[in-house]
């Protein structure tokens, strides 16, 4: 077998059996290998940002990495924004990037670039293969690094001649999935701090948000009479009736400061200290008080489940039902005009059981999370890196990883345009995704940001930079042109009708919601 074939077989040995791909000339031997090894599901994406975002969504649902296949430095550069988001979400990805043949790089052909330099800011591990005999070993190392807890981005650069020359044997992947044990003295100190603090809080993220762990944290919180909070943006959170009602720290700086000011001690489990998303004139970057006592109890690489068992024993937690479990509370479907509040009520009423909600609703959806707390049990995925164009690609990956679950993609119209090519992949793969485009025909979030940075009377030129009118986007035409059936709605009644249709039918469907 050649080098590319040895890499594909190694990926399959390591349970990496999906490749989100946008190949070019340098990757043709890898593409050819896909004919021979049909267990690898290769999914074509028309833009590299769709491929990298899809790999992110896949990992969030399956907890195992997919691979990407990108073309040289410019192709990698096109995928950087969603690799950034994936890194912030701690998603594991085997990111394969084609390169010129080793002896061609020195010729400085038009597409020659510093691929390692481009990859490094969004990767935990970067390596260029130097021999076709080594590519399988390098591939096994990439898989191992991508699977380091909680998940890492491993970029493997594949020169053309290492793909076409005779390769070595496929390699087995030797994983090290051991989690770090939280020291007993740190747990003991936390017990004391929780008892002595006047107003403690538990801040959770990552693996602490897994349903079993969050349930145990809620029992601990009940015992010591303190609240649990989480970040505004989380990679994955299972919520809804029968699950813990997670309360997020507000996105808006003033609201976050107000919420957090009362807590003198914050126990951090799998999360990071609260900071503002941006810097603003005369507003704090750190959202807590200067004298807040932080106890970093467990990081994402720690055995959070084991730590919680020890902490529960030392606090004396009974096997009680936490009082923060959400009760089933389906809102009544409203009538009349469409606005953010009525949209949230429709979502709360109609989200099906075990659905996956990918939230890039931006300003329209600020209250959706809370409005769906009593809905049927479902999973919520947020953008952890803030780079827009996240939603539809992540929905692709989630649908591939979890084909038996309905995926709902909540999208702002401006954000969706960054990775609009995602619709074509949804159609080609017949993925079970219902897309809601919230068409406020503007970068509405930036209108608020103008005020936040002190611009009180923006002029015509400034406002034109935030408008998506003249011409207005026609999402129904765009979607149908990509092969996804679509409708436009401007009343709640029509939204309910077509949302029910999209949820009932298998396959992709888009609703343009006029605001």
Predicted regions, residues:
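Generic recognition of flexible, low-complexity loop/linker segments
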Residues: 143, 188-191, 216-217, 254-257, ...
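N-terminal alpha/beta PP-like core and its mobile active-site loop of ThDP/TPP-dependent enzymes
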Residues: 1-319, 350, 433-435
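Conserved short loop/turn motifs at secondary-structure junctions
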Residues: 205-209, 332, 412-414
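Thiamine diphosphate
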Residues: 96, 104-111, 366-515
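Active-site diphosphate/adenylate-binding microenvironment
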Residues: 4-17, 22-25, 30-34, 323-404
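Phosphate/pyrophosphate-binding active-site segments
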Residues: 133, 157, 270-365, 445, ...
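Generic enzyme active-site microenvironment
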Residues: 229, 358, 410-411
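Short acidic loop-to-helix transition motifs that present clustered carboxylates
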Residues: 27, 48-53, 76, 364-366, ...
């Amino acid at each position: 077998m050649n080098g590319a074939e040895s890499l594909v077989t190694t990926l399959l040995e390591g349970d990496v059996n999906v490749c989100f791909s946008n190949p070019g000339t340098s990757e043709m031997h890898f593409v050819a290998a896909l004919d021979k090894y049909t267990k690898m599901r290769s999914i074509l994406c028309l833009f590299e940002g769709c491929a990298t975002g899809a790999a992110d969504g896949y990992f969030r649902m399956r907890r195992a990495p997919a691979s990407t296949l990108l073309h040289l430095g410019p192709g990698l550069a096109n995928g950087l924004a969603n690799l950034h988001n994936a890194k912030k979400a701690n998603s594991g990805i085997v990111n394969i990037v084609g390169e010129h043949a080793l002896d061609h790089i020195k010729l400085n052909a038009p597409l020659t670039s510093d691929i390692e330099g481009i990859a490094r800011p969004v990767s935990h591990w970067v390596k260029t293969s130097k021999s076709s005999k080594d590519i399988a070993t390098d591939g096994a190392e990439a898989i191992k690094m991508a699977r380091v807890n909680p998940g890492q981005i491993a970029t493997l650069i594949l020169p053309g001649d290492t793909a076409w020359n005779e390769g070595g044997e496929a390699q087995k992947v030797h994983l090290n999935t051991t989690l770090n044990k939280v020291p007993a003295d740190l747990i003991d100190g936390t017990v004391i701090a929780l008892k002595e603090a006047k107003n403690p809080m538990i801040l959770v993220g990552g693996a602490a948000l897994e349903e079993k762990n969050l349930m145990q944290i809620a029992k601990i919180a009940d015992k010591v009479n303190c609240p649990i909070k989480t970040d505004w943006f989380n990679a994955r959170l299972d919520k809804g009736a029968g699950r813990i009602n997670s309360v997020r720290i507000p996105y808006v700086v003033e609201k976050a400061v107000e919420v957090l000011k009362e807590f003198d001690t914050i126990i951090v489990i799998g999360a990071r200290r609260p900071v503002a998303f941006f810097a603003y004139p005369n507003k704090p970057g750190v959202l807590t008080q200067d004298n807040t006592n932080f106890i970093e109890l467990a990081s994402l690489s720690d055995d959070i489940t084991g730590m919680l068992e020890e902490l529960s024993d030392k606090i004396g937690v009974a096997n009680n039902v936490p009082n923060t479990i959400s009760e089933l509370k389906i809102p009544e479907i409203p009538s009349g005009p469409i606005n953010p509040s009525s949209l949230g009520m429709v979502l709360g009423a109609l989200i099906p059981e075990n659905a996956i909600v990918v939230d890039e609703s931006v300003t329209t959806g600020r209250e959706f999370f809370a409005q769906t707390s009593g809905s049927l049990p479902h999973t919520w995925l947020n953008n952890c890196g803030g780079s827009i164009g996240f939603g539809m690609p992540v929905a692709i990956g989630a649908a591939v990883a979890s084909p038996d679950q309905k995926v709902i993609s909540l999208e702002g119209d401006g954000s969706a345009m960054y990775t609009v090519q995602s619709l074509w992949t949804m159609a080609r793969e017949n993925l079970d995704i219902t897309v809601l485009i919230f068409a406020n025909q503007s970068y509405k979030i930036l209108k608020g940001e103008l005020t936040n940075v002190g611009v009180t009377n923006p002029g015509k030129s400034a406002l034109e930079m935030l408008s998506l009118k003249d011409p207005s986007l026609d999402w129904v035409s765009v979607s149908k042109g990509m092969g996804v059936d679509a409708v436009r709605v401007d009343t709640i009644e029509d939204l309910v009708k077509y949302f029910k249709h999209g949820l009932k039918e298998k396959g992709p469907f888009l609703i343009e919601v006029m605001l």
